[in-house]
Amino acid sequence: IYDKYADKGIKLVCRGMGTTGYGEHLLAKAFRADYHTVETVAHTTGCQKFYPDTTFVLDIGGQDMKAIWLNDGVITNIMLNEACSSGCGSFLENFASNLNIDVKDIAKRAFSSVSPAHLGSRCTVFMNSTIINEQRDGKNPDDIMAGLCRSIIENVFTKVVRVANTKELGEKVVVQGGTFRNRAVLRAIEEYLDMNVTLAPFPGEMGALGAALAAKKHIKEEGYANGESSSFIGFEAVKKFEYTTQSGVRCEHCGNHCLRNVLTF
């Protein structure tokens, strides 16, 4: 975006920077962010920008998922699945690769299925054997992909959310995260819940949007930490940003003496 405007002679000025996600603190240090916030809050903030009446947010990313309940805009409950990726995007990508299906074609192939495989909600290890059994029973790659898209949703509602009645999700269910760019997964959740759900306008970027909005709000209420401008290092500095990595560095801060990767910038 910066280069696009620069080519037209327009200089963009960053009024504030926010970070979130797994690299929240690291990136905040590296690029001198004005504010950082946890993922659940960032995703909720991004969602409420477009849908203030949201009652339930389901974010499915590449490696984890987040389920967030809201009441009058206030978070009332959060459930996470961080230990297992069997209901996430990487899970789907890995099996698509095994079936020689391009990621971009997953939804198309899934919708082409006449008889989706019944795979259930299993971890990756057991899913492999289940898929082999389904293939032996005559299921083709399209059927397997359709079954996997359904399996992701089954995993969410049997392993993470576990609601007795879908009414517990409220009337406004919003889904986001890059996995929902796959329309077959979107269709799977609507079929599973037997209700219409709302797809966020920028599924894979809602957390980033929420972090930006949180930074904007923080600056408006608290002001800048240093002077009257953002502490962000600047777009040109980001383009030239360099760092070094040291692997296998022994940590001496406690008796565990773990091996760490150290990034220096």
Report each predicted region and the residues it spans.
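Active-site nucleophile and cofactor-binding loops and adjacent substrate-binding regions
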Residues: 12-19, 34-43, 58-62, 79-87, ...
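Glycine-rich phosphate-binding loops at beta-strand->alpha-helix junctions
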Residues: 20-23, 151, 164-192, 203-207
